[in-house]
Amino acid sequence: MNEFPVRVLSVIAPMTQLNTPYPSTAYLTGFLRSRGVAAVQEDLALGVVLALFSREGLQRLCGEVERLPAAARTACTTAFAQRPERYAATIDAVIAFVQGRDSTLAHRIASRNWLPEGPRFDALDAYVDEDGGDPLGWAFGALGVQDRARHMATLYLNDIADVLRDAADPRFEFVRYAESLARSQPSFEPLAQALAAPCTLVDRTLQDLTQAALLKHQPTVVLLSVPFPGTVYAAFRIAQTIKTLRPDITTVLGGGFVNTELRDLSEPRVFDHFDFVTLDGGERPLLSLLEHLQGRRSVQRLVRTFLRQDGRVRYVHLAEPDVPFAEVGTPTWDGLPLDRYLSLLDMLNPMHRLWSDGRWNKLTVAHGCYWKKCSFCDVSLDYISRYDAATATTLVDRIEAIVAETGQTGFHLVDEAAPPKSLKALAAELLARRVGISWWGNIRFEKSFTPLLCQQLADSGCIAVSGGLEVASDRLLALMKKGVSVEQVARVTKAFADAGILVHAYLMYGFPTQTVQDTVDALETVRQLFAAGCIQSGFWHRFACTVHSPVGLDPQAYGVTLLPLPPVSFAKNDVDFVDPTGVDHDALGVGLKKALYNYMHGIGLEADVREWFDFPVPKARVPRQRIARALADG
């Protein structure tokens, strides 16, 4: 008999990722079941894509394209309109292929004689074979038919996504939906207007799927976890549909976006769609909320919960201990269609593909961050500041349970930065218990990762790591309290690479006081790290100052002045600032990203870094052998 006579449905709202479920519902469902609550889950993000990218979905899309006036036609919609029957004839087979259900189709896809090719395929013309042979041979060789076909299939699906965006809903992307309506949006008005507007093809599809989920699960409570701004609009559209069809169902909003951006929520209209909004770790607030719905706890005793009373937003927080990380239970993917996710190959880079290819079980080694000092990070918030680790025994118990349930042995450790001590213990436990898995995750490039430890991690199944090199400048790394140096990062990343572990570097530009010279020097350092085989992949992030970060809380310490925020009743996170250096970081970012894209394809590693910029920049001051010397001295 359940402790609570309620039925909780946790929903993944569009859009997150396509190759594997976003883990929030698996975590919540596993926890609630461990406490005796009837809990189920549904991935409407995947559902929307599978409905739209089907023969029936393309027939609907074709109608949208036909209704476009000639002046609104784009290269994408024109290419699609010229051969809709070829798209309709191939879409279901391509989806089956990227789901892993029809591997022999790879030969036909790779031939380039079967799929209709839209503008996305133009990128293949950039690859030139000097001998006039296969321009993609450098990436796939003679036998890489499956990967070649997966890349072609991804281009094909991206073409259709472009048509969907141009003809049916300009807000649609595979990994985000209507993001601008929520990100640091001080007023709820843009979102309210979008929710009141006529439904698009994507909206109608989402409404149909929501109705089907309600009929299937018959929930009394629906939890919508929104990790990113690009999931918020869809979550509100789902809640709107629920309140139209079943106003008796309690709707609850939570997740990473709420935790970072809605902490000062005062907009009553949010509660036209959601009965409650909870902050930070969801376990304790949900337990108190379920008790309240049972009549066993008064509203005054809720935990970290917003609600509307007498037309005004009220925040209620009875301080109670959070559920220890060791007691949150094992995530469960029960109820999610694990054989229906799409493994895609966008970037021809072995490390970068991990984010879009493969059905990875998500697992957290520890709650929060053990370092929690970085100046750009939201270190004042619970998801960073409350560090709570589980033992290696507990983690491997969870791993074994997840493998038994899913039949999948790949794990993505989704910590902000997994602690070296915990990873060492995890590796030892995996090896001692002879648990064979593949795993990868986020770390800090600190000196604790010795060559010996890196090899131990590889022996336990570690295939890749990602970590922050950020600005690649010792002065700026010290200013941001990163706790590493460039030379240290070089030695640690090389230790991982030498152990056969792929390395991805998170890179940053536009940090306070960063000059053009600093930026050019950083790119030269990154070039050397690629050339030395220390890193195989990277991504440049434009620094954004948030109100919860040390920079946002004490801007004078970083030499910048914050611009006043408008009145906020909805979302608050990013805050603009004035940096006296006056550098045009956006212009520099174009060159940085161009260089990195080429480095990840093994191109331009000997070129002067100034060649990547469209305007004059100073010569790099970094010695061309800086990284080589650091590795030799290590």
Residue ranges and their predicted role:
Residues 8-16, 248, 396-502, 509-511:
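Conserved SAM/AdoMet-binding glycine-rich loop
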